[in-house]
A protein has these predicted regions:
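Phosphate/nucleotide-binding beta-alpha loop and adjacent structural elements of enzyme active sites
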Residues: 1-311
């Protein structure tokens, strides 16, 4: 051991360990993307990924001792990734600039934990891209339920020609506009501040207590705001889009309604779909049924009961 230590400096040893973690993390990610992993392998990959972030300097506020603790089995999985860091301040309603491994996002004080989770799900788990259902170069993408724009950022990195972001929350929409100001100016991103629904009109929209995510509220809710509702078929016509290649949809249980408002789009353009199916108990049945009613030629597969993919 003494001979080994004298030959390999501590810095080189750390580098070798880091390379081993990166290789192992890459192998885990490869298996995940090819549906060859169980939940345990997914968790192992996320642990290794955190050390990779530390080696790359992405989490400078976390010490090496703390980073090593977080990869241990005793550390709660959902609390392992404290990767969103507040690095700047700005005007309301988006007073915090967050730095994440996916880039910088304007948001509120509440958004740190949500950005942690979204980074974990999307940068490591690829929850919206599996097998043939992925964003391709020059795609036109609909990001339905855009939130602060994490998937919009991923789609742009994949080479999407245009991303249409649909987001009803006025605070999220304002933060999104600030984050993607340059991309909006050069025409690669367009924001539609509305809720996707089966028909145009207005809806009652209620925010969560701990974050800026929200959902369509029931008639009895007294704390909801009124937001504009759009049918995606109508929106496509209004924007004069000649194609849509990929739709990501995560809208807190309103997915079946939004898909019903996109029947013509699904029937004539057949975009690849990544749809959340865990918000309502019957989503795993109702969402695929809505897609098949619009276009019976879709092939589909699911992932752990959370996501459905159509192509």
């Amino acid at each position: 051991m003494y001979v080994l230590w004298s030959v390999i400096s501590p810095r080189r040893l750390i580098l070798l360990i880091g390379i081993a973690f990166v290789v192992a993390g890459g192998a885990g990610a490869f298996l995940i993307r090819h549906n060859a992993s169980l939940r345990t392998l997914y968790e192992l990959d996320t642990r290794l990924w955190f050390l990779q972030l530390k080696l790359q300097g992405e989490v400078p506020d976390v010490t090496w001792t703390e980073a090593l603790r977080r990869v241990g089995p005793e550390w709660p999985h959902r609390e392992r990734f404290d990767v969103a860091r507040a690095i700047g301040s700005g005007a309301a309603p988006c007073p915090v600039l967050w730095q994440t491994p996916l880039g910088k996002f304007w948001g509120t004080e509440k958004d740190g934990r949500e950005l942690d989770l979204l980074t974990l799900e999307q940068a490591v788990g690829d929850i919206y891209e599996q097998g043939p259902v992925a964003v391709r170069d020059s795609d036109v993408v609909l990001d339905v339920g855009a939130h602060l724009g994490t998937f919009t950022r991923i789609a742009l990195q994949r080479g999407a020609r245009l991303v249409i972001a649909v987001e009803p929350n006025p605070v999220n929409a304002a933060c999104f506009e600030r984050t993607f100001e340059e991309e909006i100016a050069n025409g690669r991103v367009r924001l539609v501040q509305a809720a996707a629904w089966h028909s145009p009109g207005s809806l009652q929209f209620e925010l969560g207590n701990a974050s800026q995510t929200g959902h369509v509220a029931g008639a009895q809710s007294g704390s909801a705001m009124t937001v504009r509702a759009v049918a995606l078929d109508d929106m496509i016509d209004e924007l004069k889009l000649d194609r849509v290649d990929f739709i990501k949809m995560d809208i807190e249980g309103a997915e079946r309604h939004a898909l019903a408002g996109a029947r013509r789009l699904l029937a004539t353009r057949k975009p690849r779909l990544a749809i959340c199916i865990y918000h309502a108990p019957d989503d795993p049945v109702a969402v695929p049924q809505t897609v098949r009613e619009a276009n019976g030629t879709y092939k589909t597969f699911t992932r752990e009961g959370f996501q459905a993919y159509f192509y």
